């Protein structure tokens, strides 16, 4: 436990602040600390200059480091999925962790969460703490049913793994062994490079490793291996073909080309889904299958990947479209992606659309036909016609970017910004590779809260309330009032963490500050907080006192139980305040049944009416005129204790009585009764308000108390602590009863199915004028200042393949959420003409060819894909290694995340769009389609082109 004065806390604050700035170095060890514990520590040491009110205050002492909030239940080392740095945890270097542990210790039963710093990136190296380890399954060759799971860092070597396996299975040091990587049911790959790391070897989450012991006669149970397999860092037995991908049922030749699944390497369904959508984009796949990419590989582009991504992509596409395999394992492709985009190098679930964006950009730069990009000065429209500015913007784009990706996926939109001060209009035309469409925001969210009633005998009740997504605390209280009948203005909303009030909310605070994992308690207080001048509301916490040693008078304390809010008379006596507190806790404070307790039962106040008219449901005795006040004691300490009652004295409100409680807990009758006083009170008081003592009383027999409104604040940093002696706590405090609660029927509430929105609604929302946020202003060249301008996006020209990203995921400082709105999108004949402002836009009808689906929420989920095979024209469902037929009525669902549309005029011929590359630039910029002899006589196309004309 940390002790000492402010100087010691200054050292703590300074040391940790310095160590938090430590640079990451490959191989170093860092430690995770739960952010909620760390925030409490920051309060205690006055870490932030604006929050030093409680510095050194034992009432906010953080206690032992508690990382339980980061861990899965029942697992001392397995982290919850999708934890976010700084939001959920803080990273500390070894020295910083050791200091914190020496000052505060670690919660009993917990282990340090240590993680290595690994190096990532192919050309630009950078270090990163590997928060999530790779879980491997280990077994012996002779007994593969006995599987042991262990977690390793990507920086760990094969030798490290083998030593761990030998240790697990008690293999003697003199016994010769070798290690195998087991795929599927009967495919094995020897891991014979002991210095290679897990990352180098391409081992993935859930991979099975088999250790094999040499026979006594010098032979190996699995036979000899052949270390000469081409294109592999590791070798396979000679009977197994291996070229970067592992196949199911080698030699099978009756598969429909393209109907090839992708094995899940461990949370890689996002990659599989994205790849299946691209694989079933006919123009792109034909380009790679016909080897056109080889003549356009750009090895010198500083923005590219030296052609590695394009070559790896091509190899995988060829395997999937060979018709030989029902599925392949894209291990080499995953490794290449991780080398150039370290964010995808691990085995955490990632965003499919983010990977698509990387792949499209990476393929573009690897295949960019421009070998030397010229510098181009961007120009504003300055009143010029849109057609002129659009053509100029597209030509400039092609001078630096010209690839198959541009040919297929790039379009042009118009951006208009208007300054609110000087009315300056800025018009630019910018290329896009995909459209990210906003969804109508979910207007509501559900929160689980606990309502604590005034009646002390009533258990807290858990409710599920529906509140506005963009609302405030008053909205929560209003919703809870409808369910409970408690007026909203009689509620106070709090966040309880680690036996203390983490936050006490004001009614106008935003609900976005409440996170999903917060424990929200709402207290009923029967006073008008703005008009009642006779009462004050105080937060009350429970503490267990203890001595540091038998020969010292220095004491410490630790919090326990649930804190509560309580309204008490502003002028009071110590006796009456004690009685009010005791009655407030009577549901879980035991009545003495010991025969040795000759003085009787607990000390409760006389004639206290549980259902009375007091602010806590308790009738209050005494006139304010009886309660005198006095100036504060100059000798009072910062955290002043109200002394225990003299053993020979008795409260003026206490008279003798009997206790007939059968279950050992206070009942309504016993609380109402006239109970005798204890020889010794169960607890004493300590009040703290922003580090100052705010209870003033006279040290005489009456012990009058006055709460000063100039000093008292309803704040999580101001509270009354009830200090319990350990023996009395153990004897009289029922912790199980204190934690008990009931569930309201609303907890079982399931939100009704939401009405669907049309894809066109999302496009309209995309093109709606909006005001820029204060955090994202526009620099006005006229005003020479950043302004919150209005911005409007319009579509000018569309590409042959239109990728539509439905923005389902939203992120904020306090919350992560997924919109599960059903978007109704057409499978055939998506007509985009009404959204194109270019009067010569050309063909603009699309058919759906692929969909990436995401099932689940922010905390996890699974990606799959629907795609239309370019050869047989049928729909299929791709779920990792599984491929099955699908019907069109399955495709539109609330799981749809990324849509791939192909323009109808590009389906003719070989499947590659009938646009000549040399003239593609002018066509895309102007929107005028190139006509073939066939098209020029096609009345349907004439009608379609006419329909695409902009009309006003």
UniProtKB/Swiss-Prot annotation:
It holds the Pfam family USP7_C2. Residues 7-118 form the DUSP domain. SMART domains: DUSP (SM00695). GO terms for biological process: BMP signaling pathway; monoubiquitinated protein deubiquitination; negative regulation of antifungal innate immune response; negative regulation of transforming growth factor beta receptor signaling pathway; protein K27-linked deubiquitination; proteolysis; transcription elongation-coupled chromatin remodeling. Keywords: Acetylation, Cytoplasm, Hydrolase, Mitochondrion, Nucleus, Phosphoprotein, Protease, Thiol protease, Ubl conjugation, Ubl conjugation pathway. Phosphorylated. Phosphorylation protects against ubiquitination and subsequent degradation by the proteasome. GO terms for molecular function: cysteine-type deubiquitinase activity; cysteine-type endopeptidase activity. The modification N-acetylalanine is found at residue 2. Residues 2-223 are annotated as: Mediates interaction with SART3. The modification Phosphoserine is found at residues 932, 936. It comes from the Eukaryota. This is Ubiquitin carboxyl-terminal hydrolase 15. It comes from Bos taurus (Bovine). The gene is USP15.
